[in-house]
């Protein structure tokens, strides 16, 4: 088994969540890799790196899936990516602090597909609420639970 590492699906990850991750990587001396199709601002650190992938549908997701290992954590709001990560034995956590598991991922995929069908038929479903202080705290708490094991 490889070493612990955190991967971030960084194009859509909110900045306050990235800040929490930057602090955690420094505190725990833990590799943190942000994957995006654009250059990101990351603090200078031997633990924090970024991978810039080409633009295109799910290119960053595929990079993460190709490199993730069972000891890794992936931060993503992308449910299909979370499903692939879980299939590889790793953990996936969304930016609101919800851990995707083998028990809940099928339901999440079904709901995502249902909402996508509604949108494609012209129904306006709205987007997610803005990230709240409670969401940030929930994320930090869930991350800390994982970090305790590292």
UniProtKB/Swiss-Prot annotation:
InterPro entries: UPF0178 (IPR003791). Transmembrane segments: none annotated. It comes from the Bacteria. Pfam families: DUF188. Belongs to the UPF0178 family. This is UPF0178 protein Shewmr4_1560. It comes from Shewanella sp. (strain MR-4).
């Amino acid at each position: 088994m490889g070493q612990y590492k955190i991967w971030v699906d960084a194009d859509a990850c909110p900045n306050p969540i990235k800040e929490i991750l930057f602090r955690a990587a420094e505190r725990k001396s833990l590799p943190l890799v942000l994957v995006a199709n654009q250059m990101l601002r990351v603090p200078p650190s031997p633990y924090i790196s970024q991978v810039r992938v080409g633009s295109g549908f799910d290119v960053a997701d595929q990079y993460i899936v190709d490199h993730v290992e069972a000891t890794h954590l992936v931060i993503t709001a992308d449910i299909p990516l979370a499903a692939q990560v879980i299939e590889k034995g790793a953990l996936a956590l969304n930016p609101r602090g919800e851990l995707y598991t083998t028990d809940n991922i099928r339901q999440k995929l079904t709901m995502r597909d249902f909402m996508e069908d509604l949108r494609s038929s012209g129904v306006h479903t709205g987007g997610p609420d803005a990230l709240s202080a409670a969401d940030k705290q929930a994320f930090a708490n869930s991350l800390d639970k994982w970090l305790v094991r590292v």
